Swiss-Prot record:
InterPro entries: Dxylulose-5-P_synthase, THDP-binding, Transketo_C/PFOR_II, Transketolase-like_Pyr-bd, Transketolase_BS, Transketolase_C, Transketolase_CS. It comes from Bradyrhizobium diazoefficiens (strain JCM 10833 / BCRC 13528 / IAM 13628 / NBRC 14792 / USDA 110). Transmembrane segments: none annotated. This is 1-deoxy-D-xylulose-5-phosphate synthase. The gene is dxs. Binds 1 Mg(2+) ion per subunit. Binds 1 thiamine pyrophosphate per subunit. Its EC number is 2.2.1.7. Catalyzes the acyloin condensation reaction between C atoms 2 and 3 of pyruvate and glyceraldehyde 3-phosphate to yield 1-deoxy-D-xylulose-5-phosphate (DXP). Keywords: Isoprene biosynthesis, Magnesium, Metal-binding, Thiamine biosynthesis, Thiamine pyrophosphate, Transferase.
Length: 661
């Protein structure tokens, strides 16, 4: 197939001279509105653009916070790709998308770059609705090659000639989905360019002039033509001689290009490794790759996280994601916490339980610090397992441990646990194995937006037989629920808790297992009943105070369990109150739906005994903002709860508030 080639750059005297502002810190970058402007520059000016792009990225993230190290690591690569390829006609897909801030600056979004991850501002990831230069959205890892192959096949079917480029990191490459896609791509032989951004040196040997020279050689047309001719001759040779010739070619390339054998076996033409910060190496290789005419290609690029900013280079983990910081010192503006973070409470509680029970083990899928498993790892390194970006494997690995009498705690964000759903059903629930799921980031998560929201676990776990489902109302409840999970040894269980800090309440010294399927009364009233599942309990208390000011006596109950449901508590609330409202930090199909199903089956709603309402997340994917703003928009704050009560009473909350005043 004939590939699309970007127009050749003008040379010599035909090169465009771009007028720049000598007083700006980024004079050349200031002239670039889209990659079309970048492609008008002389090659020697591209280095300056990259330097200025790095400075702009540093300055922008210092104002907004966000993912930092990954973006700095791909500044030269981003610049080179947009210079060589004809984006957006050539499709450029960033795996995960957290490294795409420089890409956004070059593709017409620089004027909004300081709105990153704020309400109404730019997404922290690639997003189709944001720009034509984001042909495929992302935030979860290891999807780029599959999406890219789909685009490449669509191009072939429609007779197109554009390139498709997928940029994927070595961490994301560890996930099974990436290899499934590569295996399929190699078999289909469609034109697809995969750029492996190796920023952890986990695959690559040292790079330098020899590697760059060989990469240019092997990606060049002369070598490829000779190689193809040799293949045709080889077909006419006796099989034994042909096999030996193949081995000679494989060994010679494998010896010089160590690391490419696996990709060649998957059907990719391997080029690299090359220095991802050296434009003299990157540009000619990418140009050669652009002009290749058939088959999938993998370009192995070695980069450094945090490149060009000293503090980030010295501490890649600390600067992977940052809050606002001082550019001169690197000091991050972290406010002193008012209460412990939920993931830390989980980690500390699990350590205390493990000190008493040697069968307890912890599993994480590449998120040890985010889940609190790093705390457990410090105390019990031999009982901690980070399986990488492999949620499917993590779940079944935990099931295997449980089948042998161990007590695995599988700590995974709600949004990422979705990736292991079949394993939860097939390997855990059907076999009734006591895997303990610690579901972090339940509910809305703020700046990371819809892709990271933990909206659906109540619904997707609630339909499974044998599953115990709990939600912590506060950090003290979390301690007791960890102890409860330890005690549940006859079936699987899940415990959900949100991102961020707790309420700052008094903490128990040790966790005490709760009675399974029993909630608790928080405040006794007579007219209105608020039944909370999770950390909306604090908003229910605020709402009850406001309702009391309107003369409405309000009961508050904490359900604690969604499965098994505290049916006695639900019936009591329904019989003793005029209005019953459930409140949860999850989608339709969760806790409220289970309560509604029970009340309906009991006939409790037939005679109008109680006015029943549910409060759930809206049936939309909410854009990023602060968690408080997102919950307010969803109507799941105290104000929204009060409004729901007045709606059920057939009254207007605004009118009632005026009367009260």
């Amino acid at each position: 197939m004939q590939t699309h080639r970007a127009p050749e750059r003008p040379s010599g005297a035909d090169k465009l001279e771009i007028a720049v502002n000598a007083y700006s810190k980024t004079p050349l970058l200031d002239t670039i509105r889209t990659p079309d402007d970048l492609r008008k520059l002389k090659i020697e000016q591209v280095r300056q653009v990259a330097d200025e792009l790095r400075q702009e990225t540093i300055d922008a993230v210092s104002v907004t916070g966000g993912h930092f190290g990954a973006g700095l690591g791909v500044v030269e690569l981003t610049t080179a790709i947009h210079y060589v390829f004809d984006t957006p006609r050539d499709r450029l897909i960033w795996d995960v998308g957290h490294q795409a801030y420089p890409h956004k600056i070059l593709t017409g979004r620089r004027d909004r770059i300081r709105t990153l991850r704020t309400g109404g501002g730019l997404s922290g990831f690639t997003k189709r609705s944001e720009s034509d230069y984001d042909p495929f959205g992302a935030a979860h890892s290891s999807t780029s090659i599959s999406a890219g192959l789909g685009m490449a096949v669509a191009r072939d079917l429609s007779g197109g000639k554009n390139n498709v480029i997928a940029v994927i990191g070595d961490g994301a490459m560890s996930a099974g989905m990436a290899y499934e896609a590569m295996n399929n791509a190699g078999a289909m032989n469609s034109r697809l360019i995969v750029i492996l951004n190796d920023n952890d040196m986990s695959i690559a040997p040292p790079v330098g002039a020899m590697s760059a020279y060989l990469s240019r050689l092997y990606s060049g047309k002369t070598y490829r033509t000779l190689r193809e001719a040799a293949k045709q001759i080889n077909k006419r040779l006796p099989k034994i001689i042909a096999n030996r010739a193949n081995r000679v070619e494989e060994y010679s390339r494998g010896f010089m290009m160590d690391g490419g054998t696996l990709f060649e076996e998957l059907g990719f033409y391997y080029v690299g490794p090359i220095d991802g910060h050296n434009l003299d190496h990157l540009l000619p290789v990418l140009k050669n790759v652009r002009d290749m005419e058939e088959g999938p290609i993998l370009v192995h690029v070695v980069t450094q996280k945090g490149k060009g900013y000293g503090p980030a280079e010295a501490s890649a983990d600390k600067y992977h994601a940052v809050v606002k910081f001082d550019v001169a010192t690197g000091t991050q503006a972290k406010a002193k916490p008012n209460a412990p973070a939920y993931q830390n409470v989980f980690g500390q509680s699990l350590v205390k339980e493990a000190q008493k029970d040697e069968k307890i083990v912890a599993i994480t899928a590449a998120m040890p610090s985010g889940t609190g498993v790093d705390i457990f790892n410090k105390a019990f390194p031999d009982r901690t397992f980070d399986v990488g970006i492999a949620e499917q494997h993590a779940v079944t690995f935990a099931a295997g441990l449980a089948s042998e009498g161990y007590k695995p705690f599988c700590a995974i964000y709600s949004t990422f646990l979705q990736r292991g759903y079949d394993q939860i059903v097939h390997d855990v629930a059907i076999q009734n194995l006591p895997v303990r799921f610690a579901i972090d980031r339940a509910g809305l998560v703020g700046a990371d937006g819809a892709t990271h929201a933990g909206s659906f676990d109540n619904a997707y776990l609630g339909c499974l037989p044998n599953m115990v489902i709990m939600a912590a109302a506060d950090e003290a409840e979390l301690v007791h629920m960890v102890a409860t999970q330890v005690a549940i040894d006859d079936r699987p269980s899940s415990l959900r808790y949100p991102r961020g800090e707790g309420r700052g309440i008094e903490m128990p010294e040790v966790g005490i297992p709760l009675e399974i399927g029993k909630g608790r009364m928080i405040r006794q009233g007579s007219k209105i009943a608020l039944l909370s599942f999770g950390t909306r309990l604090a908003e229910c208390e605020k709402a009850a105070d406001e309702l009391a000011a309107h003369g409405l006596s309000t009961t508050i109950a904490d359900a604690r369990f969604m499965k098994p449901l505290d049916t006695e508590l639900v019936l009591k609330l329904a019989r003793d109150h005029e209005i019953l409202i459930t409140i949860e930090e999850g989608s339709v199909g969760g806790f409220g739906s289970h309560v509604a199903q029970f009340l309906t089956d009991q006939g409790a709603l037939d005679s109008g005994m109680v006015k029943f309402r549910t409060m759930v997340l809206p049936d939309v994917f909410q854009d990023h903002d602060t968690p408080a703003a997102m919950y307010a928009r969803a109507g799941l704050d105290a104000k929204g709860i009060v409004a729901k009560v007045f709606e059920a009473l057939g009254k207007d909350v605004k009118t009632e508030t005026v009367k009260l005043a």
